[in-house]
């Protein structure tokens, strides 16, 4: 029984701390809400690379 509890707690700890790797140099994002570095890197025509406070994402550009 105690082995089950230890394995369960270990598995829970691993899953809770598992996060996708943050790639600050992400490229090739060709849809909305994907990380980008600059407009030329990954945003389609009519989109701009805009900061959301933490990361940058491709968003529609509605004007000059």
UniProtKB/Swiss-Prot annotation:
The keyword Signal applies. One of its GO terms (cellular component) is extracellular region. This is Putative calcium channel toxin Tx758. It comes from Buthus israelis (Israeli scorpion). Coiled coil: none annotated. Residues 1-18 form the signal peptide. The presence of a 'disulfide through disulfide knot' structurally defines this protein as a knottin. Disulfide bonds join 29-43, 36-49, 42-58. Residues 19-27 form a propeptide. GO terms for molecular function: calcium channel regulator activity; potassium channel regulator activity; toxin activity. Keywords: Calcium channel impairing toxin, Disulfide bond, Ion channel impairing toxin, Knottin, Potassium channel impairing toxin, Ryanodine-sensitive calcium-release channel impairing toxin, Secreted, Signal, Toxin. May increase intracellular calcium release through the activation of nuclear inositol 1,4,5-trisphosphate receptors (ITPR) of cardiomyocytes, thereby causing an increase in the contraction frequency of these cells. It is found in: Secreted. It comes from the Eukaryota. Belongs to the scorpion calcin-like family. Expressed by the venom gland.
């Amino acid at each position: 029984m105690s082995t089950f509890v230890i394995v369960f707690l270990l598995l829970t700890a691993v899953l809770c701390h598992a996060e996708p790797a943050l790639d600050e140099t992400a490229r090739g994002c060709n849809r909305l809400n994907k990380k980008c570095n600059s407009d030329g890197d990954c945003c389609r025509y009519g989109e701009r690379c805009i900061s959301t406070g933490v990361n940058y994402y491709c968003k529609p550009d509605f004007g000059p």
